[in-house]
Design a protein with these regions (language model features):
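Active-site and ligand/interface coordination hotspots across diverse enzymes
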Residues: 1-41, 53, 207
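Short catalytic helix/loop segments, enriched in acidic residues and glycine
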Residues: 44-52
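Short connector loops at secondary-structure junctions
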Residues: 57-75
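Residues at the starts of beta-strands that form the adenosine-phosphate
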Residues: 24, 57-58, 102, 134
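Short polybasic linear motifs
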Residues: 187, 196-199
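Glycine/proline-rich loop-helix segments at beta-alpha junctions forming the active-site rim
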Residues: 75-189, 203-206
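Feature marks short, surface-exposed loop/turn motifs that line or immediately flank catalytic pockets
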Residues: 34, 68, 111
């Protein structure tokens, strides 16, 4: 069903899920639920339909946290740093694998519920902000100014550009402790992407 599928820890983590295509849409949510390579869930079904309706013949669902959980409040308050880093690098890898990256930001209000959501967002953005990336949101923003989660959408809506830099600086109140160190931000995105892609295409991965 889905030829893009990366999971870990006996499927307790899902890094990426999607379908290959000539025109790819990357989606960044909060955390994965029950969808697998052989079975979609409600979120994946909506995401795939929105992608097709808007001219994308492929998509990949990524998340700020890779831990599977059906309710966000059941996620741990803290997460292993290496799990976070591996997930962040995979997000970067998939985004940069597209010649003209388009990224649908789709986390909703829940991004404020765990610090590691914000840490992951900052890491990914700061690492690749010099790249030409089309950051998008679908439909109206939430009352608090967050890009809306796919569980609450109208297929008649459309994509609009999203100023992710301003969002991080002002919409999200970001304590200093959440910001990556200067050493972390020195990661070369092309190098990270090459290392992760070595020997295989990012959009043709089933494990």
């Amino acid at each position: 069903m889905f030829d893009i599928y990366i999971n870990k820890q006996a499927n307790k983590q899902r890094i990426a899920l999607g379908k290959s295509g000539e025109k790819m849409l990357s989606i960044i949510g909060l955390n994965p639920s029950i969808a697998t390579a052989d079975r979609a869930d409600a979120t994946i079904t909506r995401v795939e339909k929105v992608a097709k309706n808007n001219g994308y013949d492929g998509f990949v669902m990524l998340n700020l946290c890779p831990l599977r959980c059906t309710h966000i409040n059941l996620l741990p308050l803290n997460i292993n740093a290496q799990i976070c880093l591996n997930n962040q690098l995979q997000i970067i890898n998939f985004i940069l694998a597209s010649p003209e990256p388009a990224v649908w930001l789709a986390w909703g209000e829940g991004i404020t519920l765990r610090e590691y959501f914000l840490k992951s967002l900052v890491y990914v953005f700061e690492t690749i902000k010099s790249e030409k990336i089309n950051w998008l949101h679908f439909g109206p923003l939430t009352k608090a100014g967050h890009p809306r989660h796919p569980s609450r959408l109208n297929y008649q809506w459309g994509f609009d550009s999203f100023d992710l830099n301003s969002y991080i600086l002002s919409r999200v109140s970001m304590p200093n402790k959440l910001r990556p160190s200067s050493k972390t931000l020195a990661v070369n995105p092309q190098s990270a992407s090459r290392e992760l892609r070595a020997g295989s295409s990012a959009f043709n991965t089933v494990t």
